Amino acid sequence: IVIRFAIILHIFLPSRIVPLFLFLLFRAKVSYKTVCDWTNKFANGIVLPEYNCAADILICHVDEKYVKVKGEWHYWWSIKDCFGNIIHAIITPFRDYDSAKKLLQESRRRIGRDVDILIRDGLNAYQRSAKFLGRKCRSVIAGIKGKGFIYKKKFYWITNNPSESLNSEIDFYLAKFQNNFANLESANRFANLFMLRKHLKKCLSEKKLSEASSLLIQAINF
């Protein structure tokens, strides 16, 4: 029960704080490194529910940001839909076409349908790899101020604010939990836990308690 409780706490709290709760509640003395080991061993078996979007037009936002791995700058790539759901995230050493392609290919498999509009920054790799989200996916550059856009005879006001706000959340999460990773594997594991945490918080805010409970049960039934 100590390990199970530690994993649930670590999804929401820094590893250095979790041992304090374990000691107060169970008088169990464990190190923060042990908590991290437990999470790495068991929590990554948690599978997020299948992505489901019933909207006629699916709009996604994509962006990348810096993150440190072994003291060197790498890139955290994220894609989310227009409803605030994080679809996928990866961390790679380079800000290039291959990384963008990997993100969008894996995202397309998770989405299970074509994306209609991809809102992005000026990185050319997105333009070249947008086809992996669907043959007819429209790749559109938009900044914080936004701009008008016509798609299938309908007017849309598009902005890349959702990506910028997500990057701010990632920065806060990194500052709170970890700002440098030992290797690329641990960095991507951390990105997966970030997605899990975001999904759980969204489930709870939308009162989808059964879905949140199912994910937490996965965390403790190992």
Regions found by a protein language model. Give the residues of each.
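Short, positively charged, Gly/Tyr-enriched micro-motifs
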Residues: 1-59, 64-70, 106-108
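Mobile genetic element proteins and their domesticated derivatives, centered on retroelements
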Residues: 6, 18, 35, 63, ...
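Active-site beta-loop-alpha junctions of metal-dependent nucleic acid enzymes
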Residues: 41, 89-113
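The start of beta-strands in P-loop NTPase/AAA+ ATPase cores
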Residues: 58, 76, 83, 115-116
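A short, conserved beta-strand element enriched in hydrophobic/aromatic residues
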Residues: 76-96
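Short, surface-exposed basic-aromatic patches at helix termini and helix-loop junctions that form
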Residues: 80, 106-110, 130-138
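Helix-centered, glycine/charged polyanion-binding patches within enzymatic domains
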Residues: 122-179
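Basic, amphipathic alpha-helical segments enriched in Lys/Arg and hydrophobic/aromatic residues
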Residues: 168-222
